[in-house]
Amino acid sequence: MNNDQRLERQSRIRNFSIIAHIDHGKSTLADRILERTGALTDREMKEQALDAMDLERERGITIKLNAVQLKYKAKDGNEYIFHLIDTPGHVDFTYEVSRSLAACEGALLIVDSAQGIEAQTLANVYLALDNDLEILPVINKIDLPSAEPERVKKEVEDVIGLDASDAVLASAKNGIGIEDILEQVVEKVPAPAGDPTAPLKALIFDSLYDPYRGVIAYIRIVEGTVRPGEKIRMMQTGKEFEVNEVGVFTPKAVKCEELTVGDVGFLTAAIKNVSDSRVGDTITSAVNPAQEALPGYRRMNPMVYCGLYPIDTNDYNDLREALERLELNDASLQYEPETSQALGFGFRCGFLGLLHMEIIQERIEREFGISLITTAPSVIYHVTLTDGNTIQIDNPTNMPDPQKMDHVEEPYVKSTVMVPNDYVGAVMELCQSKRGIFVDMQYLDENRVQIIYEIPLSEIVYDFFDQLKSNTKGYASFDYELIGYRQSKLVKMDILLNGEKVDALSVIVHRDSAYERGKVIVEKLKELIPRQQFEVPVQASIGTKIIARSTIKAIRKNVLAKCYGGDISRKRKLLEKQKEGKKRMKAVGNVEIPQEAFMAVLRMDDK
């Protein structure tokens, strides 16, 4: 292809993504667009065509990004090349959204015409605005009896400040308005800018591991051209590779001769390790490198940590392999080996948030068949010691002695809750109970309110989201962003079973709520740990001070069963003998802890 042809083709490329809150019909709309542009035959067409993982289909959410190239013949007679990038809508995956948005020039903003704007819609719109994208509002689900498209249009204008006068009214389920959406993409989304003859610059926005071809990098070409056989360099890591093949997704991977400015496709180059093709990194030519990398790359830092241990200790190496494999596709997963007296060998893993953590656990159990025990999730605390040094703690067991600590800081988040008028009280009560600090409250229209609180992340990590949903009958939507660290009165609470500390059950709690938490946890463990042949005390302690206790009663065999009547001293002798045996057992006895016990430490809501 000569340069003029490249430039002509470039003017017909439109790169866009779809952003929406969970369940507003994003993947369904993507299905309709694939259908309308003839990307899939009827036989291949299935619900959520771009969601490849079983888990995505089951939960009805999008976890990984997907990119497709589509051909569309517009009303002006030209054939346009669309690159549609489907993004996750969940708050844990915002960084995947931000990367896919960086690969686009435009975004379709989908708003449910019955529910209106939700908290994550806002979060994603701000990400799109940060990337200077052209945003096209689409009011979806207009076939619902409860749809109020005019109200929602007004909301889009008032809350986001977008002009919604020519927003497309659509129903992705029934295929209404799809044509209008595609025409708007042609008219309003700008063609990619960039020089095909300049040194190569390509943004990696996702990577995937294939056992035969190594790492497959999903890329968007910003400048220059790339062909098989060329040498490339990763600008963050400085490593060099030779390109084996380049191609596009239609949604199936199809090889092509070259990728040039504006193309969204894939590249393989015998890259063995996914950490060599970091998401957000820039690929350039090794022979004629670009001067500077594309902006916006940042390493994703985990927000939530927890321990993963195999139930069967022989599975340890399989678990390591599973984590290595998942890490290949998931740049934000971090892990390191750790040991626990109670659980043996395992890994301390870092995740972006709770949904991310659940999904990784579920994928390990499903795809690799390993049964797991997970410990309570915790966040990263900054501990300043009396000698002036600051250390970071992501595991409660590593918390230093109270005498050595000067103060502890914990991460705070700014949480935005959008909720119908009737539930404002319930939401405020919940936020207050989680040590929230009230910031602001705004009425979006006559019956929807946006409430902003600053809450410690550790309070959100447990069950904030579940409680929020149940307190508002599922109507609230929620989004959070980290705002920094603040000093708090935090203490480490240990749980003792039979006088032994169980390291995996330790939690870091606020001093004011320690007594309450201790009492609840101890009672819960009493119910969940099976009764032993001997009496087991369950205690919660802060340092050496016991703050709560409960006792699991022993199971007792009736040793008097075969004494019919008879002398009392004979019975007493048997009972004394039994008592001696129990005492001996108690001294050497080990208590098995079921998985539910670890989760009980977290779930404080069903007191």
Curated annotation (Swiss-Prot):
GO terms for cellular component: plasma membrane. Its EC number is 3.6.5.n1. It is found in: Cell membrane. It is an enzyme of class 3 (hydrolase). GTP binds at residues 23-28, 140-143. Residues 11-193 form the tr-type G domain. It is a peripheral membrane protein. Keywords: Cell membrane, GTP-binding, Hydrolase, Membrane, Nucleotide-binding, Protein biosynthesis. SMART domains: EFG_C. One of its GO terms (molecular function) is translation elongation factor activity. GO terms for biological process: positive regulation of translation. It holds the Pfam family GTP_EFTU. It catalyses: GTP + H2O = GDP + phosphate + H(+). Required for accurate and efficient protein synthesis under certain stress conditions. May act as a fidelity factor of the translation reaction, by catalyzing a one-codon backward translocation of tRNAs on improperly translocated ribosomes. Back-translocation proceeds from a post-translocation (POST) complex to a pre-translocation (PRE) complex, thus giving elongation factor G a second chance to translocate the tRNAs correctly. Binds to ribosomes in a GTP-dependent manner. Belongs to the TRAFAC class translation factor GTPase superfamily. Classic translation factor GTPase family. LepA subfamily. HAMAP family: LepA (MF_00071). This is Elongation factor 4. It comes from Shouchella clausii (strain KSM-K16). The gene is lepA.
